[in-house]
Amino acid sequence: MSKVATRFAPSPTGALHIGGVRTALFNWLFSKNQKGTFHLRIEDTDKERSKEEHKIQIIKSLKWIGIEHDGEEYIQSQKVEDHIKIANELLKKGSAYKCYCSTKEIEEQKKRARQKKLPYIYNRKWRDADEKDAPKGIKPVIRFKSKIEGNSKLKDLVQGDVEIENNTIEDFIILRNDGTPTYNLSATVDDHQMGMTHIIRGDDHKINTFKQIQIYQAMGWDVPEFAHIPLIHTIEGKKLSKRDNASTLDDYSKIGIMPDALRNYLLRLGWSYQDKEIFTLDESIEHFNLEGIGKSPSKLDMSRILSMNEHYIKTIDEKDLYQCLKEYCKIYKEEIQDDKETKIKSSLSFLKNKAKTLEDI
């Protein structure tokens, strides 16, 4: 059996979302529990929005909460030629085809689907057509030839057995008409080349998983295990988005939430072990498993985060608390001067009993 290998694959287009942090945490904990490796892949193929400073901030944010990846970062944009090569291999195998539908044709198909109140699925016009009939002046996309008959089943390590009718999966694009690969192709090729054994991600990726499994099968590659974790919702029960307040890791560190407290909270957000609430880092690694992840969305509750943070402030060793406070002030307030250090340290035993955040202190 292969050594367990997991990954977290953010796009460097902005600050790290709290949902992404939990996904990274679950991947990291699972790999450590299984004595495996955890890898970071930077999905930076969106050249307009991807920024080096965002990549640096993502790595810093993960490190802040205690997550460090093994080896070098895997940079997706450096592997584009590999993705294109696989698209062409699929074409040669007969597992993909060139589609010459114009933008206008596709829009008309989508319009008809909307009128009938049906989900849009490409009509597979060019699936079995002769390329000799290809119109001039149109650059084709390459589409994967998805299964049409029967059902596909997935043994999801969190959700259980999941089944889908194959005719609901369209012949999805793997190479755009400008020659650039799409997400489902790139992610599959990268995961294969990186030797990933377990793909742990949000359950909004379930349909992508069925598409990606077909690419694995068409290429004759080993298919990894998949686990889809429920998304995080707001306290009102709506899907948490980047537009919500306190949706990024920076939002929490800025108000004085301690990394250990936030990590403990995110661990318990959708995962449980007996009736235990507080976990040290070592305990988290020892007890974490995929069986403990629930199937329903979890609600992000700020009052519980503050309560967890208050517990850590009150119980942490005062030397460690001072170091956290010193680092917090250096980044968000003003650096603590040496002549104030003794006074602050002597006051911590009193101040920590009145505080829920480092900002309160």
Per-region residue spans from a language model:
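Catalytic cores of large soluble enzymes that bind and process phosphate-bearing ligands
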Residues: 50, 75-79, 98, 145-146, ...
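N-terminal Rossmann-like or analogous alpha/beta NTP/dinucleotide-binding catalytic cores
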Residues: 1-115, 207-221, 261
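Short, structured secondary-structure boundary patches
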Residues: 57-65, 91-95, 115-126, 244-248, ...
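Active-site cores that bind ATP or allylic diphosphates and position pyrophosphate for catalysis
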Residues: 93, 97-228, 233-240, 248, ...
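Short, histidine-centered active-site or binding-site loop motifs used for metal coordination
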Residues: 8-12, 42-44, 189, 193, ...
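Catalytic adenosine-cofactor/nucleotide-binding cores of aminoacyl-tRNA synthetases and other
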Residues: 207, 219-361
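Conserved S/T- and glycine-rich ATP-binding loop of Class I adenylate-forming
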Residues: 90, 144, 305
